[in-house]
């Protein structure tokens, strides 16, 4: 099993190219099921979850090809299976996003209950309840969601009990081929939802309000394929900016989108970073200074993202002052804290809040990645830890970061993949 070996590094410096957003690419790939003609998606990152998504589409009978670049081609003319099996779904929670497209286009779907990062319940009931309101008959048997609809789904006025990106995306895709109008209230506003909506519109869907808490969809008879480019990964961008901040460096993230990171950039400025942006780049310069502690509370977009919580925990561990970080989105999302404490961090958990007293340096140690974003924080911690840090179980990292060791090396970081 691969590991990352990290040595203490100097201030990071240089340019890093940001990959396409995994959390946008996965639903967009699933949306290919809705298209009756060939569908081409570019700027798709080469990640384990993307490979699993492509394999899932092939399992359903779709033709999926990927060249040497970041482009994926999908043809569903031969799609003739409607079951997403456990062996594929167990490793990736986003597999549930195949449910809406299959049901909307073919009227039937069997999808194994999903896996993915172990950071809380993240129940699928919001997905199922919304589809039932659209006329689907759903049963859960032997670990499988079995969904059927006679004819086409029907438009519905859906009020979601809580904000859910995945449920918003699933219902949005399903509604594009439903009879009549669907309105999704309390919808997620994340940029990845907007990216999916823009892709669906390019395929012929009629959607208004993506990016607000009320999305209106007029169902159409059919959707066609298109050529669509996935948005930049805002969480990868934020992770590299944190790495530059804690190493007191200066980097530029290119092929990035600053408009999707306003809450993160504001907190980095509060921490003492000098931030400069262009239309597709972000530059951070710490001017050799130690970051200042910042208080964080995770909330749905456009507030501070839960996917940046672990990275800001690390920033505060090394910052000047005392801080609190409160997690309101997922339970069990402080599993990186015991590992950082093993490296010398001064932090304490009280319920869903972490209290952190900043220190100057960490000590290298052998640590274990527990989920995708926690693993990123541990790798960055290794850059500012005296001695050697070994991060085990980096298959979590490979689910969300493309060529991370090469990108860090390009900035001057001492990161090496080993067995």
Curated annotation (Swiss-Prot):
Catalysed reactions, as listed in the record: phosphoenolpyruvate + UDP-N-acetyl-alpha-D-glucosamine = UDP-N-acetyl-3-O-(1-carboxyvinyl)-alpha-D-glucosamine + phosphate
Binding site for phosphoenolpyruvate: 22-23
One MF annotation (Gene Ontology) recorded for this entry: UDP-N-acetylglucosamine 1-carboxyvinyltransferase activity
Sorted UniProt keywords: Cell cycle, Cell division, Cell shape, Cell wall biogenesis/degradation, Cytoplasm, Peptidoglycan synthesis, Pyruvate, Transferase
Pathway the protein takes part in: Cell wall biogenesis; peptidoglycan biosynthesis
2-(S-cysteinyl)pyruvic acid O-phosphothioketal PTM sites in chain numbering: 117
Pfam families: EPSP_synthase
Active site per database record: 117 (proton donor)
Family matches, as InterPro entries: Enolpyruvate_Tfrase_dom, Enolpyruvate_Tfrase_sf, MurA_subfamily, RNA3'P_cycl/enolpyr_Trfase_a/b, UDP_GlcNAc_COvinyl_MurA
Cellular localisation: Cytoplasm
BP terms from Gene Ontology: cell division; cell wall organization; peptidoglycan biosynthetic process; regulation of cell shape; UDP-N-acetylgalactosamine biosynthetic process
EC number(s) reported in the record: 2.5.1.7
Source organism superkingdom: Bacteria
One GO CC term on file: cytoplasm
Binding site for UDP-N-acetyl-alpha-D-glucosamine: 93, 307, 329
Recorded family membership: Belongs to the EPSP synthase family. MurA subfamily.
HAMAP family for the chain: MurA (MF_00111)
Biological function: Cell wall formation. Adds enolpyruvyl to UDP-N-acetylglucosamine.
Name this protein carries in UniProt: UDP-N-acetylglucosamine 1-carboxyvinyltransferase
Source species: Shewanella sediminis (strain HAW-EB3)
High-level lineage: Bacteria, Pseudomonadati, Pseudomonadota, Gammaproteobacteria, Alteromonadales
Primary gene name: murA
């Amino acid at each position: 099993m691969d590991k990352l070996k990290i040595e203490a590094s100097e201030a990071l410096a240089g340019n890093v190219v940001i990959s396409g957003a995994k959390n946008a690419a996965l639903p967009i790939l699933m949306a290919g099921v809705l298209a009756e003609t060939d569908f081409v998606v570019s700027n798709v990152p080469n990640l384990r979850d993307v490979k699993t998504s492509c394999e899932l589409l092939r399992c359903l009978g779709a033709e999926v090809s990927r060249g040497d670049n970041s482009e994926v081609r999908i043809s569903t003319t031969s799609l003739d299976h409607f079951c997403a099996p456990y062996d594929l779904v167990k490793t990736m929670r986003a597999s549930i996003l195949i449910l809406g497209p299959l049901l909307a286009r073919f009227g039937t779907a069997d999808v194994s209950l999903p896996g993915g990062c172990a950071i809380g319940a993240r129940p699928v009931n919001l997905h199922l309840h919304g589809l039932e309101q659209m006329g689907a008959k759903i049963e859960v048997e032997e670990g499988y969601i079995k969904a059927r609809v006679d004819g086409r789904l029907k438009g519905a006025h859906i009020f979601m009990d809580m904000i859910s990106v995945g449920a918003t995306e699933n219902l949005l895709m399903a509604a594009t081929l439903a009879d009549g109008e669907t309105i999704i209230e309390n919808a997620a506003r994340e940029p990845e939802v907007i990216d999916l909506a823009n892709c669906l519109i390019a395929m012929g869907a009629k959607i208004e309000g993506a990016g607000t808490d009320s999305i209106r969809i007029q169902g159409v008879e059919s959707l066609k394929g298109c050529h669509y480019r996935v948005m930049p990964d805002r969480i990868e961008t934020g992770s590299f900016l944190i790495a530059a901040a804690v190493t007191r460096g200066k980097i530029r993230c290119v092929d990035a989108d600053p408009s999707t990171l306003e809450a993160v950039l504001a907190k980095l400025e509060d921490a003492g970073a000098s931030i400069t942006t262009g239309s597709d780049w972000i530059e951070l310069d710490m001017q050799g200074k130690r970051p200042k502690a910042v208080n964080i509370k995770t909330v749905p977009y456009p507030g501070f993202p839960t996917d940046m919580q672990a990275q800001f925990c690390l920033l505060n561990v090394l910052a000047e002052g005392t801080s609190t970080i409160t997690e309101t989105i997922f339970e069990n999302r402080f599993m990186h804290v015991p590992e950082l404490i093993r490296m010398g961090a001064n932090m304490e958990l009280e319920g869903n809040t972490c209290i952190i007293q900043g220190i100057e340096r960490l000590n290298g140690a052998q640590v274990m990645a527990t989920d995708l974003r926690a693993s990123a924080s541990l790798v960055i911690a290794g850059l500012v830890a005296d001695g050697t840090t070994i991060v085990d179980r980096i298959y979590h990292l490979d689910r969300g970061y493309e060529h991370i060791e090469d990108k860090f090396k390009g900035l001057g970081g001492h990161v090496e993949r080993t067995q």
